[in-house]
């Protein structure tokens, strides 16, 4: 395991993103975190903003237990609140193929929010197979499998404070 982005760098960047988002949404924003990977990012991002932020969560699965996508997307938990007429910001840990967010944006657009944008901590642009417009990006990273700060490998390592590259598949 090798540290790719340290805790300090993550926290610094999240503060910058929070300040930018706060400026863009002076009347408040409805944050939608994608379970479970985005939970740490969402918690820190929300506290980096001084505007009103409502929190909601949605569950989507597109990955199996390993490092590759199953290519299949399904909603595993829906939102608690309606997004109709709201300024909505989807908060995601990482955009990889784009399949998950491309699908989710279609679903949410049908519910007629006033505005709909995406904040993603990490972006692997080389891997994109479906178009996704990400308005706020923390870091662009190369095509490597990362864990920590919410990101998992087979549900492990989410609680690491740094973002690390998993170089070998653990036994
Ligand atoms: P996409 O649909 O391929 O864009 O995949 C997005 C989802 O795949 C993210 O929400 C993550 O849960 C997962 N994912 C993609 N790349 C990584 C990675 O490097 N580490 C951990 N999870 C990843
Ligand atoms: Mg995820």
Model regions and ranges:
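PRPP-associated nucleotide enzymes
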Residues: 1-171
């Amino acid at each position: 395991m090798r540290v790719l982005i340290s805790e300090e760098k993550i926290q610094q960047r999240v503060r910058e993103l929070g300040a930018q988002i706060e400026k863009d949404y002076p009347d408040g924003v409805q944050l939608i975190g994608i379970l479970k990977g985005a939970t740490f990012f969402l918690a820190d991002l929300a506290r980096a903003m001084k505007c009103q932020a409502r929190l909601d969560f949605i569950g989507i699965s597109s990955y199996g237990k390993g490092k590759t996508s199953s290519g299949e997307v399904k909603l595993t938990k829906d939102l608690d609140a309606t997004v109709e007429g709201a300024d909505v910001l989807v908060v995601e840990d990482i955009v990889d193929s784009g399949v998950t967010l491309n699908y989710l944006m279609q679903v949410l657009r049908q519910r007629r929010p006033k505005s709909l944008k995406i904040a993603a901590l990490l972006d692997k642009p080389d891997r994109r197979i479906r178009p996704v417009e990400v308005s706020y990006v923390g870091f662009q990273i190369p095509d490597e499998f990362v864990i920590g700060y919410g990101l998992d490998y087979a549900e492990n390592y989410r609680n690491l404070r740094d973002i690390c590259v998993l170089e070998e598949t653990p036994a």
